[in-house]
């Protein structure tokens, strides 16, 4: 295809409405993914016993680490497709789509190999308890069989989101997620597969979601359509995908590593505090992922409009997405402060554990909205094609800073508030640096476009 459909263009129309309409399905997709993951844990805990539950739980860090890398890689695909689509360069869009498919598949196969071969060493690295180790190794190996499929789903999601269609990925994720729940119950209760059953259900669901989204791309009547006869690795395009995607993926991976040090700080308290923290931490994923929908929308809208040379819409896209994400974080965080005990109740029946969880909520509830300034600005810089600078800043500000905080301020005071305050402090510090970098990058981008327009008139 060499056409460009106007219906999904982000370069025209009311921005506030468009960003909201694109972001809502993304937010629902993110929340559904969390709920489906929670269902895995619930089924194992309810029907397979505490050892199986512990085995699955002990793999969470590595699952987050590697899936985060794939998500970061897909962000690079999203930005590049949006850039070329906005610039109305159909051939470049097609090259990006077909090269990105191969890059994503290669990344998924690489992670599959790491999971199959390296699971024992990785789990021992975290001092996984010996009684949990066999189940954890089995879970990771079966779960990682689905990594190529997960990589392909993220690829398709990135392409559709880049052109403003976020409803299809939501539909396919809903179908796969419902299947995942049914298979969880079947494999664990009927087949008595325990840990392997939950992992197998996830793998099958990932294959289904990947198949659905790839099939949808083959039916598209536009330049971003997937044609298996055109699959070819275009080297210059591949380099651009990797330049945009690898820093984002590396950033997500480093976040997971930094959080290990924070968890070590939590583990230095008694078991009640550890349980309370685990219960309260469920709010993090729900609120972060809801806010994250506006970050992906921000990158897509900015990239399309930058490609189209519409600088006024580039700047407006950033401020509108920032306002939405900040507002959502403030509302959800405020609601958590008011209804925190009710939120924690489904996770524990012990009032002392709820009291411990509230200590985290009382710090984090008002702080979630601060993260919008950091994350939305990072997305904005990536929308302009800048990835290395924002990644270096966030690694220093939100990863290195957090580790240093744990070993200095927290080590000195050794209180729960002194540990949890590292989140808003690191977000504020990183946000200030990211905003300064974005202003610099935006001015450079404006100058580059103005020079390009001047040369075009000659």
What do the PLM-derived regions correspond to, one by one?
Residues 21-40, 142, 153, 176, ...:
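Transmembrane helical elements of multi-pass membrane transporters/channels
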Residues 53-113, 150-169, 263, 276-340, ...:
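Small-residue-rich hydrophobic transmembrane alpha-helices
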Residues 65-68, 180-184, 210-214, 286-289, ...:
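Hydrophobic transmembrane alpha-helices of multi-pass small-molecule transporters
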Residues 48-61, 136, 140, 199, ...:
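Small-residue hotspots at the loop-to-helix junctions and early N-terminal turns
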Residues 74, 143-161, 169-180, 198-213, ...:
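Short runs within selected transmembrane alpha-helices of multi-pass transporters and secretion channels
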Residues 10-47, 61-76, 80, 105-112, ...:
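N-terminal transmembrane alpha-helices
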């Amino acid at each position: 295809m060499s056409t460009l459909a106007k219906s999904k263009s982000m370069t025209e129309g009311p921005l506030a409405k468009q960003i909201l309409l694109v972001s809502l399905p993304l937010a629902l997709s993110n929340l559904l993914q969390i709920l489906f993951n929670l269902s895995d844990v619930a089924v194992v805990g309810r029907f397979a016993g505490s050892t199986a539950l512990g085995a699955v739980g002990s793999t969470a860090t590595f699952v987050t680490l590697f899936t985060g890398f794939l998500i970061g890689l897909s962000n690079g695909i999203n930005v590049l497709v949006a850039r070329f689509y906005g610039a109305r360069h159909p051939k470049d869009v097609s090259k990006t789509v077909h090269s990105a498919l191969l890059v994503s598949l290669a990344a998924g196969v690489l992670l599959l190999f790491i999971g199959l071969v390296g699971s024992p060493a990785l789990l021992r690295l975290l001092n996984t308890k010996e009684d949990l180790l066999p189940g954890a190794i089995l879970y990771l190996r079966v779960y990682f069989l689905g990594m190529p499929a997960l990589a392909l789903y993220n690829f398709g999601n990135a392409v559709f989101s880049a052109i403003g269609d976020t409803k299809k990925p939501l539909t396919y994720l809903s179908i796969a997620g419902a299947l995942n729940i049914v298979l969880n119950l079947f494999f664990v209760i009927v087949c008595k597969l325990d840990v392997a059953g939950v992992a197998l259900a996830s793998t099958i669901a990932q294959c289904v979601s990947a198949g659905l989204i790839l099939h949808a791309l083959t039916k598209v009547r536009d330049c971003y359509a997937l044609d298996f006869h055109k699959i070819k690795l275009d080297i210059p395009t591949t380099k651009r995908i990797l330049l945009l995607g690898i820093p984002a993926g590396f950033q997500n991976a480093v976040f997971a590593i930094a959080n290990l040090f924070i968890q070590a700080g939590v583990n230095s308290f008694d078991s009640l505090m550890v349980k309370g923290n685990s219960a309260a931490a469920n709010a993090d994923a729900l609120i972060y992922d809801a806010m994250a929908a506006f970050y992906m929308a921000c990158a897509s809208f900015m990239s399309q409009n930058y490609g189209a040379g519409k600088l006024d819409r580039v700047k407006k896209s950033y401020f509108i997405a920032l306002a939405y994400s900040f507002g959502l974080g403030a509302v959800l965080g405020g609601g958590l402060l008011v209804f925190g005990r009710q939120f924690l109740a489904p996770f524990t029946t012990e009032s002392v554990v709820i009291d411990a969880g509230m200590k985290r909520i009382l710090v984090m509830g008002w702080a979630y909205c601060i993260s919008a300034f950091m994350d939305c600005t990072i997305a904005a810089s990536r929308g302009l094609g800048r990835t290395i600078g924002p990644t270096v800043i966030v690694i220093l500000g939100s990863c290195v800073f957090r580790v240093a905080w744990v070993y200095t301020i927290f080590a000195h005071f050794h209180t729960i508030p002194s540990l949890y305050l590292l989140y808003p402090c690191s977000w504020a510090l990183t946000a200030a640096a990211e905003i300064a970098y974005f202003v610099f990058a935006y001015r450079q981008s404006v100058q580059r476009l103005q020079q390009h327009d001047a040369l075009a008139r000659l």
